Amino acid sequence: MYEKIFPNKRFKITMAFLQKHISKSESILDLGVENPFSKMMKTDGFEVRNTLGEDLDIDFSTLKNEKFEVVTAFEIFEHLLNPFTILNEIKADKILISVPLRLWFSEAYQSKTDPRDRHFHEFEDWQLDWLLEKTGWEIIDRIQFTNPVKKLGIRPLLRLFTPRYYLVYAVRK
């Protein structure tokens, strides 16, 4: 599921955003199984626990039964059928979310080898903002950034200047 070449630009921007808003003394629940970025957070001194691969559309008991100060969800919500329920169930006071933005020149992502690795939602920034607002979160900071790929073609050229990722820090109202 994870590439052998890590998305360094995306990871650097995400780590800087995390460091800007979250103290290393705060407990973090990172939605999704342990991954290269959650390992980077731990190496950087953050106290991180990941979910165990349960289907969060069906089993969100970790969110209901345990209290963390921060929940992070890096490229998770686009895979969920109902992110509204998850956002409602989170007991933390802070959340950091990143989602890939819907690109007008690219179809929704669907892995050809892993049936779990597909995007049910392709967000525009206003859609995630609205979802957060409706579930009781107040956005404090947000950024969009590009993630160019080193390939030839029209889509790689468009990715040089078209924002690809949306990163949001919000607090519970």
Question: How does the language model describe each region?
Answer:
Residues 1-70, 84-93, 115-130, 141-173:
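Conserved N-terminal segment of class I S-adenosyl-L-methionine
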Residues 81-85, 107:
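Short N-terminal helix/helix-N-cap motif within the alpha/beta-hydrolase-1
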Residues 29, 74, 97:
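Active-site flanking residues adjacent to catalytic metal/cofactor-binding acidic residues
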Residues 33, 78, 101:
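Short, glycine/acidic-enriched loop or turn micro-motifs at the edges of active sites
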Residues 131-137:
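A structural motif corresponding to the C-terminal end of an alpha-helix
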